[in-house]
Amino acid sequence: MQTISATYGNLSLVIPAFQEENGIRQAILEAEEALSNLNLSDYEILIIDDGSSDSTYKAAQETAALYSHTRIIRHEKNLGYGAALRTGFEASRYEFIAFTDADCQFHLEDLAKLFDNIKNSDIAVGYRFDRQDPKLRIFLSRGYNLLVHSLLGSGVKDCDCALKLFRKNALNKILPEARNFFVNTEMLHKAACHNLNITEVPVRHRMRYAGKSKVGWKEVPKTLKTLVPYWFSNHLFNASETQGTISKEKKGNLLAYFTGCVILLLFSALLFGARLRTPLLEPQEARYAEVPREMLLNNEWVVPLLHGKPYLDKPPLSYWAVMGLYQIFGIEDWAARLLPCLCGIAIILVVVSWGYFAGAPWEGLLAGFILCLTNRFIYLERMLAPDSLLCLWTTLGLCLGYLACTQKKMNLACWLGYSLCIGLGFLTKGPVALVLLAVPIVLWTFLDKRTLKPSLGMWGFALITAILITLPWQIAVSIREPDFFHHFYVGQNLLRYVAPLDHEEPFWFFLPHLFLGTIPWIFLLPGFITTICKPNSNKQSMGSFAGFGLIAGVVIFTFFSIGGSKRPIYLLPVLPPLAIILGCQVMALVTQKREKIVWQSILIPGTEGSFNFLGIILLIGLGISFAGIFRGLLKPDTGFLLGFLFLTSLCIWVIVKAALPDKKMSFAVTGAFLFLTLYLGVSELLPAYNQLFSIRGQLRAHLKFEKKKPSLVVCYPHLWDSAPFYLPETEVISFSRSEKSQMILFLNQRPNTLLLIKSGKDRKELVQELPQHLEFITDAQQGTVTVGWIRKKSDEHLQGNLVP
């Protein structure tokens, strides 16, 4: 008798089973018959009963007793399809391991095809070329395969086909963690990450032998709940943060890092500390300087005051901070502006420290530089408003929340700091702080499975801490002002968000502000998206630090975009997470070997000579734009717009010019150029702009030749907050549009009155309606508000030298 030599080696076949009492016998019979005819040296069949409550286990035992190759392993409770497979894989003894389902939908003779194709591969997977499932099952499977291919770039036609063959050493590298039907996707993605060779083989398919499929609509959300976090943690942001850690052995790296920190601190101090004496702009800065002034003069620490009346639109923390600065430095506009400037420097330091403690020090340092050299951040964070302080609490809170959840066990000190930031943010701007700080942490801990998920008790602790911080003030102000709750929570928060009375803008309102305000760094964003979404499964360029920055930035940006009321300063909390994203992208660019840098895609010069000529033209255009403003050749708005366009183009030109050949030098030159440009802006352009368009500048111009300060100032159509701030000893009254006739009568009785009126239509109508013997005299350049005198036409101006 001729003996047939074995050609395939030893095989372990794993068959998970759950509630398969009517089909498990047939599954074992078919497996024994097919494997006995496969020319195997030896084989074993492992039936994994996943806690079935029917007679699956009993039927499997009875059938296995007839064969020496079949073993039964039982879970005491149902752990899931993936858990059953892993149990079988770990119990397997042989060099080749295959698995199939207990529904008998595959012809196990096709394992021979898989063996034939695994000779030069690590894994052989089947794909069903003649699928016999119900239409719903086929629809769900095809949709899922399309989704997996789009997200993970697996490249496998039929990833959930339950007929696969592995080499044991390869399988040990990709053992699944998922317990549900996501197990196939997970193993294939891990195989791609380990550069394992995968061969696809067509296999036959048929209807179930008995029972009902366990896959249906109910499995879709369960699988997505596993797929999306896996995609986020293992594909988009799968790098280890320790890759960028500063090597202690290399003192040069440590010296370079701390030198960079010192330079960044110097840049921040110069950009935020320059020309703080610029006048306050209406209406925002003047209001938030006047409220703490009135509170301080009235020794009022509970109820914010504006024009002597309760002003309950915002909580008092930013007012308290400005009051403290007034007490130290006196009631000055520059003292009030110290608050946002100190907040701006602190935010940059928080971002750098965040990266350091997160294991991404260079990314954090680069993010700090990008934030410091972002024109929108410098402009908005120098502006006096509660949003500046809110941005600090938001950034610090997100940093501490991130660090609390990325340790081996929950860092209670960081979580306490996170909780305090929620309370302080609430005391600065209201319940919006809870949304900005809680939603990113909740979403991130769901998506990134490498993190610790805060328990309900931890969230309760955070909420109680925030309440303890804010409740004393809320109780005190409610006792004094019974209408506080409705005005603050309903009017200023809920209705302002869903049905605003002012500042209502379309959904896309922030997009142009974000784009123009972050040039040139925003051009890194497409490269960042390309980097994280590229199909290479084994890429490792971005880690959890970048992932959290993306989540936080998207959540905050979306929240404010959905809201009805929109103002440009609401963008502030978005900018630190965006800087983190772009800092990680810069780090990826300067550390990866690439022939071309991303900036080169912005502009491709025809020749070196023409490119240099373009730079000269842009520089000349920039100079002409701002020279035209100060010489009166161009309107200020036109000149600033042209100057900004030329400046932006020049920034891009410098970046492209510096991109060859050293990428690090490219970004260094770009940063230096941006710093010089921004410093010019904050030291010369912004003060000039504020001087031209603020009320302080116009008041000085009109009072320059007066012998004494005016005893009365009239405001129309509302009270301008700069008037009482800069003329604290002067009586200030206001008239609304409905009171125009009374105002004209009042001015007729009180000529020689200083009038502050809104420019445009209001000013034009008033001039037309004044009595013939009165005239409105204004010599100062108009801004939002026009300042002038109401005088009798025969009056002569008194000469003097009084300058407030």
Feature roles, as predicted:
Residues 1-9, 153, 176-258:
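Hydrophobic helical membrane-anchoring modules
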Residues 257, 416, 531-804:
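Membrane-embedded architecture of ER/inner-membrane glycosylation machinery
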Residues 250-599, 724:
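Membrane-integral, polyisoprenol-dependent glycosyltransferases
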Residues 49-58, 104:
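A conserved acidic beta->alpha catalytic loop
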Residues 39-52, 73-75:
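Short beta-strand/loop segment that forms part of the nucleotide-sugar
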Residues 75-91, 96, 105-181, 208-226:
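Acceptor/aglycone-binding surface of glycosyltransferases and processive sugar-polymer synthases
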Residues 46, 57-91:
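Conserved donor nucleotide-binding strand/loop of the catalytic core
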Residues 1-33, 40:
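N-proximal low-complexity "stem/linker" segments adjacent to membrane-targeting elements
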